[in-house]
Amino acid sequence: MEQTWRWYGPNDPVTLADVRQAGATGVVTALHHIPNGEVWSVEEILKRKAIVEDAGLVWSVVESVPIHEDIKTHTGNYEQWIANYQQTLRNLAQCGIRTVCYNFMPVLDWTRTDLEYVLPDGSKALRFDQIEFAAFELHILKRPGAEADYTEEEIAQAAERFATMSDEDKARLTRNIIAGLPGAEEGYTLDQFRKHLELYKDIDKAKLRENFAVFLKAIIPVAEEVGVRMAVHPDDPPRPILGLPRIVSTIEDMQWMVDTVNSMANGFTMCTGSYGVRADNDLVDMIKQFGPRIYFTHLRSTMREDNPKTFHEAAHLNGDVDMYEVVKAIVEEEHRRKAEGKEDLIPMRPDHGHQMLDDLKKKTNPGYSAIGRLKGLAEVRGVEMAIQRAFFSR
């Protein structure tokens, strides 16, 4: 695997010098300063590429080229936004950057309720608490019809939890959910959030798939033409939330994408932490079935709690993800490609990490502190080395 590291650009508290010292060779980054929907110019792409290369690294993967909400709702200037997206892909290819991670999650990107969940060892992790999320949706957002998405027990527990919250607790929970986490391209006030949800009131799973198909049928031929590999990121968490449909959550969703546009440019990001939240997702089977189309991997683990919809981010080698079997399947896919004469490695980044040690005293991007990811990268690197030596060195 190619060892990579997500970097949020010049304002990231983790520097490119830090990235290089961590042992990564590739950088995963994006032009976050360019508004959603606008074309990434060759000039801006080359400027960022030069910064990365001057640090002795390569820009391996774009994460992400965001998809404008008009495309997802099939409204407004969606045709222009699609044309802009096509041009951005052409410009990236012209600059030699050919792997693009993206997602099709409506309104919200990845979602957590607690950004400072304290683990028994004193380090901090990200957490999604189903009951706190219900408290937000039922008692703060007050979304009409939300009760239908929860059990009677969850509704009662959410009411109890809300009753114990201080004003600061409520503000923090709201901020965590709607203000935008690292890598998310949208942040909202509560009123803006309600208005954006309203845009989806008539969009169910079938309609969102229809809109996604329009996007794929416009984008994938361009990607194929210029040699770009599109790698869709799964929904996080991988299930409907806030009345919004989610359509990249299961192996059936992956198959639907392939059936809709059967091109090798139409591929996947294997994010084990996102897919792995669902107990019915067999990660190794996903890799084996769609291995030739996996162009990027995010390796992390989560731990489901007593309520199976509540989870926290575990250490990379712990939790519900069998990281050994996952890495073994990825390495096997790389060797399959090598046997076909393809030398390209699959870019891997240690996705998220616990805030720990000296980073507990620093301002960090949630999930993206240096030391926790350094630990994760070292652990995954060790797993890969052991697998390579045990199975492929003869």
Curated annotation (Swiss-Prot):
Gene3D superfamilies assigned: Divalent-metal-dependent TIM barrel enzymes
Pathway assignment: Carbohydrate metabolism; pentose and glucuronate interconversion
Recorded superkingdom: Bacteria
Any GO MF annotation of the entry: ferrous iron binding
EC number: 4.2.1.8
Reaction(s) the record says it catalyses: D-mannonate = 2-dehydro-3-deoxy-D-gluconate + H2O
Keywords: Iron, Lyase, Manganese
Enzyme category, top tier: lyase
GO biological process: D-glucuronate catabolic process
Cofactor names: Fe(2+); Mn(2+)
Family statement: Belongs to the mannonate dehydratase family.
Function field: Catalyzes the dehydration of D-mannonate.
Protein name: Mannonate dehydratase
